[in-house]
Amino acid sequence: VIERIVPAGTETAEAYGDLPEATLFPEEELIVKSAVAKRRGEFTTARHCARQALTRLGAPAGAILTGERGAPQWPEGVVGSITHCDGYRAAVVARPALVTSIGIDAEPALPLPSGVLDAVALADEQVAVKELLASVPQVPWDRLLFSAKESVYKAWFPLMRRFLEFEGARLVFDPAGGTFTAHLLAGPAIAGSRTLHTFDGRWLSENGIVLTSVTVPA
């Protein structure tokens, strides 16, 4: 389903559980050598998905190490994003001629634990979430907001190389259109010669998972 919220011309792969054929390169093994089995399984299958997507793109499908703040290190000439949560793993990759930066995030379609919304949402976002929960209760809008902010960060970091706090972007959802706009309160993002004050995102809630994406087109 991830292909429904990313641009045409990108390549994706996804899995709804850990795959027995998924393996890691020795360099990747070092990243999760101390991880619990659940985390290791998610990481391994997510890397497997990433290599599937890279192969479809015609790019080298070797080890994908982690760089600053855990961001995946893609082969030269590739931009992409990886996500994994309970019951879902996915990756998307693209060529820089099409996409400057992209972020995806998956979360279980469940309400956030008590207190988390207060920690991640601005006051007006909290009001909007409560209104959306009342009008469209089948979507866990609090969890969707959290996911969307993760996607915003994943698209922001490769451009700016610095952390973006949750309060650094204000999100506005279109519940009917499956889209959202992120207003960059922490300052604009610089994408080549462009100065971006907003990011555009897409979302869906399906099969017990909420998915979000943010794409900065080339």
Predicted regions: what they are:
Residues 1-218:
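Core catalytic alpha/beta fold that binds nucleotide/phospho-ligands
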